[in-house]
Amino acid sequence: MNILQGSEAPLSYEEIASRAGAFDFNKNIPLKNWLRTSTTISKQAHVYVSEHDYSNGVFLLFRYCELFMKCQKHPDAAAYKKELFDYYQGVRNALEEIELIKPIVKEQYEQYQCQKNDLDDLKKLSMKDSQPSLEKPVSYVDEPILEQWALSDLQILPPSSTDLLSPDSQKLSKSSSDLPQFDYPSLNSSPTFNSNLPISSSRFEKTSLSDSKLVSPEPLDDNKDIQFIKKPIYTRTSEPRPKPAGTFKIHAYTEGGKPLRTIYLPKLLKKVFLDVVKPNTKKNLETCGILCGKLRQNAFFITHLVIPLQEATSDTCGTTDEASLFEFQDKHNLLTLGWIHTHPTQTCFMSSVDLHTHCSYQLMLPEAIAIVMAPSKNTSGIFRLLDPEGLQTIVKCRKPGLFHPHEGKVYTMVAQPGHVREINSKLQVVDLRVK
């Protein structure tokens, strides 16, 4: 499943090369936010690679490198020299991984094209041999997507393949004269540097599309924990070669047509959160929590509810020790998938403060959600900014004061069949306020 277009058909190496750098980089957004975004991208890339979905993995690795190029030119760069140097070390590792993956990605795309051409030839031959008829010709269309959610969402699909080293993407091969801070390696040949993190080429053993076949997954029992397909362990000499992991299908898209990967939300999360923050709610103080989880087979699973250190009023709340939060997330290899907060006495909506807060979450991860709990009204809602209209409105907003209106519709409720699905699954609550 291609995360760029939400389809099974892969893009070419050249196509994804041009798209890897095609994202908005707003210098008005604090550099610390972009650096955190880079960490999110890197984590996702390595999940895809570990699941043998090399095309999505290499796309994200290249976007990780592209983002580094832009971060160097951010107005706050001078204040983040150490962080940028650490980022550069990550880029070196990413480039080495790209070089190892490149031949596999190219071969997979070539195999896909050969299979597609063969199928097209068969269709033409079939149409040619058919008898003339006054009836309308048969239309070859895909089966309609099932509207009802089911674990048929999970199917084995050949990994979409790309080629990221196109002539148009050689901007990453800039010389050290263009980038005075760093000696950026060339992408045209295998790197000659020593990486801090050794990478075994056995991780990228070639996987033939012809070796893949559909496998029916075990059904998901709502009364049991989420079950993931296990990744095969293999070495260079292992037989048979590893097959691609199952992939959760895309069911929702942004207003701009970009695919949104599904987020699986524990049904008990809202109730658990209200129970944890009840003391603050009684004092008419807002409380927020961070929704953390894992990326598995092209879908996100919320596994942790983290309550960070924070300060709050009746109308606002904000974290005060982000370093501890990030340390916990990195230690457990968790992604930030959104946030949840209360409106103790108000109704369920997104205030202007909420919109600006959520903007940073959604820039970091397009699928990120905001859950608002209004206990006094016994209501709740799951929201996201409209993309691109609402997101750009908030990014460009320079209105003074915490509370101010925004023109037009800025956000929407994530309604079925949106990209959020509630399921019976375990949830771990971590309260960082407790020492």
Swiss-Prot record:
What does the entry list as the binding residues for Zn(2+) 2? 356, 397, 404, 406
A GO cellular component term found in this entry reads: membrane
Cysteine pairs forming cystine bridges in this chain are none
Chain segments carrying region Disordered: 162-185
Q: Where is the composition biased (Low complexity)?
A: 162-181
Please give the Gene Ontology molecular function terms for this protein: K63-linked deubiquitinase activity; K63-linked polyubiquitin modification-dependent protein binding; metal-dependent deubiquitinase activity; ubiquitin binding; zinc ion binding
Cite the entry's keywords alphabetically: Cytoplasm, Endosome, Hydrolase, Metal-binding, Metalloprotease, Phosphoprotein, Protease, Ubl conjugation pathway, Zinc
Q: Which residues form the MPN domain?
A: 262-392
GO biological processes: cytoplasm to vacuole targeting by the NVT pathway; late endosome to vacuole transport; late endosome to vacuole transport via multivesicular body sorting pathway; protein K63-linked deubiquitination; protein transport to vacuole involved in ubiquitin-dependent protein catabolic process via the multivesicular body sorting pathway
Mainly resides where? cytoplasm
Binding of Zn(2+) 1 occurs at 341, 343, 354
* Location(s) in or outside the cell: Cytoplasm; Endosome
Q: Which domain of life is it from?
A: Eukaryota
The answer to whether UniProt assigns keyword Iron to this entry is no
Q: Which intervals of this chain are the motif JAMM motif?
A: 341-354
What is the free-text note on the cofactor? Binds 2 Zn(2+) ions per subunit.
InterPro entries per record: JAMM/MPN+_dom (IPR000555), MPN (IPR037518), STAMBP/STALP-like_MPN (IPR044098), USP8_dimer (IPR015063)
Q: What is its EC number?
A: 3.4.19.-
In the record, Phosphothreonine modifications are located at 192
Enumerate the cofactors the protein uses.
Zn(2+)
Q: Any notes on this protein's domains?
A: The JAMM motif is essential for the protease activity.
| Role | Zinc metalloprotease that specifically cleaves 'Lys-63'-linked polyubiquitin chains. Does not cleave 'Lys-48'-linked polyubiquitin chains. Plays a role in the multivesicular body (MVB) sorting pathway. Required for ubiquitin-dependent sorting of proteins into the endosome and subsequent trafficking to the vacuole. May regulate MVB sorting through deubiquitination of ubiquitinated ESCRT proteins.
Which PANTHER family does the entry mention?
AMSH-LIKE PROTEASE, FI19924P1
User: Would you identify the family this protein belongs to, as annotated?
Assistant: Belongs to the peptidase M67C family.
What this protein is called in its record is AMSH-like protease sst2
The major lineage groups are:
Eukaryota, Fungi, Dikarya, Ascomycota, Taphrinomycotina
